[in-house]
Amino acid sequence: MQSAACPKELTKQHDKSPGVVCNEENIALILIEPDQWHDNDFTNLAFSKTRLKKGQLSVCRVEHTTQCEVYYFVVNPQLKKNPGRKLIGVAATVCKDIRAISTSTGERAFCVIDDPIVCNDDERHEVGIGVQCDCITKDYLGHAHMSFSQSLNPNEVAAAQSNLKELFRSDKKPFSIEDVFPVWV
């Protein structure tokens, strides 16, 4: 279901990338309170219109992301910036379902684009919650971005965001990181 509406979906974005995001992949959003989650529900920031317009809504490609990487690249930096934040868990869905959300004219509403974070450093890092891992290269190859596939009018934006929110809901209860991501380092 990759399409011309999302040209970046058609090629991997870095040599070290595991490849383009496939329809069968699981896509996860890490939920930090109060940013993405508050009062047992998603906040408006969870599916930020601004980030979606800029193609900067960060998500994880589950099959290409470890628990270590989630803590190191996503959770710990957020908690360090603001110790009042709290890890809630993970909301996840299948990529093809994200790509299937359409506008009132039948056009795709969202793109899911491979966007690995590649850096080099072989230090050992404490990643929190009693987990220690050896992120040898500290690469976060399972990082991806979501974006709107096109310019949408305000009503279509609201409808698309609402549909995306419903898709990521899993009985209104987030999963734990340990239940979703593999342990391997």
What are these regions (language model features)?
Residues A28-L29:
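Compositionally biased, non-globular sequence tracts
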Residues M1-E24, F47-G55, E63-V185:
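Conserved NAD+-utilizing ADP-ribose enzyme module
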Residues P34-T50:
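Short aromatic-glycine-(Arg/Gly/Cys) micro-motifs in beta-strand/loop hairpins
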